[in-house]
Amino acid sequence: MLVPKRVKYRREFRGNMRGRAKGGTEVAFGEYGLQAVEASWITNRQIEAARIAMTRYMKRGGKVWIKIFPHKSYTSKPIGVRMGKGKGAPEGWVSPVKRGKIMFEIAGVPEDVAREALRLAAHKLPVKTKIVKREEIGGEANES
């Protein structure tokens, strides 16, 4: 399970999820990627479930890159406790994902296997996604 080794503050503000992702919007390492179409918090358990679904389908072949990390803690108060009296205890870890962010990348497997593995991973996540293919940049290398 992915969790930070140490954090400066145990409790964080919730923040807002407006707009598109600043970075990580293109497939950088692998051949195929799973891109978020909407914004959401993704927990460390959901990331792990998606990773297991992909690697099991690929039969341990190929390589998987996880491009999101759950660095933000979320809190909740116990059931039956009245409002106020401070912020609740840290409950778990989430990764805030904005629109356009590539969450997972795959390489080293055929296209049909990669697409099915990413589809299975998408079912484990609470966000609408699309599968994107790496775009080759430029035609020929500059020769000098």
From Swiss-Prot:
Keywords: Ribonucleoprotein, Ribosomal protein, RNA-binding, rRNA-binding, tRNA-binding. Disulfide bonds: none annotated. Gene3D superfamilies: Ribosomal protein L10e/L16. Pfam families: Ribosomal_L16. Coiled coil: none annotated. Belongs to the universal ribosomal protein uL16 family. The lineage of its organism: Bacteria, Bacillati, Bacillota, Bacilli, Bacillales. The keyword Hydrolase does not apply. Part of the 50S ribosomal subunit. It comes from the Bacteria. NCBIfam families: rplP_bact. One of its GO terms (cellular component) is cytosolic large ribosomal subunit. GO terms for biological process: translation. This is Large ribosomal subunit protein uL16. Binds 23S rRNA and is also seen to make contacts with the A and possibly P site tRNAs. One of its GO terms (molecular function) is rRNA binding. PROSITE patterns: RIBOSOMAL_L16_1 (PS00586), RIBOSOMAL_L16_2 (PS00701). The keyword Repeat does not apply.
